[in-house]
Amino acid sequence: LYKVTAFEGMKMTLEGLKSRGVKLAVLSNKPHEATALAIKGLFGEQMFDVVWGLRPGMKRKPAPDNAWKIAEELQVQPKDCMYIGDTNTDMQTGKAAGMYTVGVLWGFRDRKELEENHADVIIEKPEEILRIQEGRACSS
């Protein structure tokens, strides 16, 4: 199993989004079983509406297909979604899917990589997601 921990402020931010009616999803290139187990262990079963890890037959990110499928499952338009991530692959996936991309600096990569991959905005703390969401139509 992958060793993962929740970044400081992440749980509070997710709870804040959930309280606003925002639908939350995870899309990972890690195997589905490991992804689902990690998310459940960190946040419980009710935080995310959809959790997808890589399964046989799925295209890997940065292909936008799975981001589109998740948006469809959640009954939201891609243009109304924020795709939040810390890598070039995340920014490429979100852009290809037509989503608003939020690059985060608390992950594995640096500002330069996120800028080079055209993040719409780059943030330093999870709480900043709440302010961004206030100005966007991300809930339905």
Residue ranges of predicted features:
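Phosphate- and divalent-cation-binding pockets in alpha/beta enzyme and binding domains
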Residues: 34-37, 69, 93, 113, ...
